[in-house]
Structures are given as C-alpha cells and as structure tokens.
C-alpha cells in the first residue's frame, strides 16, 4: 500500500480508493498512519538489562546484540534489527540523551578499561548464549531513549498500521551508557567508511 507523507491528513477509517480493481480483483488504497503513542506488549514491558552491545552490519541492516555479562551463563539478552537510517537515529538519540544526563547529574562513574586483548567475534559468541527465539531478532523502525538519575532505557518501536508497538525494551545502568554510546557511534562510522567511503580527491 502507498502511504503519502501529507502532515495535514489524519488517519481515515474510510480512505478514498486509489487505483480501481484490476481483472484479478487486486487494488491499492492510499491511507495515513501517524501514531502518537506505542503499545507496550506485556511480555516486552518488563524489559531486559544489558551491560553492553555488540553491533554487526551488512549493506542493508544493523544487528544490535545487547549483552548480559553480569552472571553466568553470559547471554545475549535481546537482538534488534534496524536499517541504516534508523541506526543514525539511534546514535543521535543515545548521544543526545547522555548529554542531557550529564548536564543534569554530571558524568556517569567510569568503568574500568577493558583488557587490551580484545576477543574475536567468534569468541564472544562462544561465551554469550544466543537462544533460538532471538536468532531472527526484533525489528524496529524508530527508537525512544530516556533516563533516570541511575539508569537509561531504549524503547525500540515498530510504527506499523494499525498500532505502533514497542518491539524491544532495553535498560542499562548509567555506568554502562557511555561505552554503549561509543560503541554505537563507532559502528556507524565504520559502516560509513565501508559502504559510503568519502570520494578520493587525489
């Protein structure tokens, strides 16, 4: 279905027909869907806690694996799939929210620096359990980020007709947020360098 972006139109339960039906009875209609709130399914409302994020990318999407390394067995608490344009929004929203937190409460306490020898991707996935129900992840086409004096949250949202809904809710401590923001920014920059390199003026 086509969804023209006319901000002056509202959701219409009886939209005007578009193209007339063809010989097979197939037709298309134009409609407006501008959600102002997102439903939170009961199974999502409690959210999951993360201590870090691992980002994988391809030309078409990003995979955000939120890690839970607090108690054993270590596991991937949530997997979220977004397109590059939404990844840009996530990086901006997370960075802006961390800036607002810092203005209100000061810099979050720093975590110890990780060891110099970084594990490979294969080693990480050997140590962090990924359950079968998370293999395909949860899709998101927008995000909302917020904070309290001690925690941050990410609400990943799908804005599909007829009802926008939260597809994943992630929470983390203020201690972990700077490293998460840095990881997201680094992943976005690496994506740009890999798939949209700057023109070579030489």
PLM region spans:
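Positively charged, low-complexity terminal tracts
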Residues: 1-202
């Amino acid at each position: 279905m086509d969804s023209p972006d006319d901000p002056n139109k509202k959701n219409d339960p009886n939209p005007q027909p578009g193209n007339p039906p063809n010989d097979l009875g197939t037709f298309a209609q134009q409609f407006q869907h501008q959600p102002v709130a997102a439903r939170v399914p009961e199974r999502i409302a409690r959210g999951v806690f993360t201590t870090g994020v691992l980002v994988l990318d391809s030309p078409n999407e990003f995979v955000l694996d939120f890690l839970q390394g607090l108690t054993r067995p270590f596991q991937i608490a949530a997997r979220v799939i977004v397109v590059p344009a939404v990844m840009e929004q996530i990086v901006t929203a997370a960075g802006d929210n961390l800036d607002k937190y810092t203005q209100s409460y000061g810099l979050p306490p720093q975590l110890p620096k990780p060891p110099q020898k970084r594990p490979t991707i294969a080693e990480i996935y050997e140590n962090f359990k990924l359950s079968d129900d998370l293999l395909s992840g949860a899709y998101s086409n927008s995000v909302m980020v917020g904070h309290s004096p001690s925690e941050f949250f990410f609400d990943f949202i799908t804005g599909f007709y007829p009802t926008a809904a939260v597809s994943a809710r992630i929470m983390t401590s203020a201690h972990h947020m700077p490293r998460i923001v840095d990881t997201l920014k680094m992943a976005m920059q690496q994506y740009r360098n890999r798939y949209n390199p700057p023109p070579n003026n030489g």
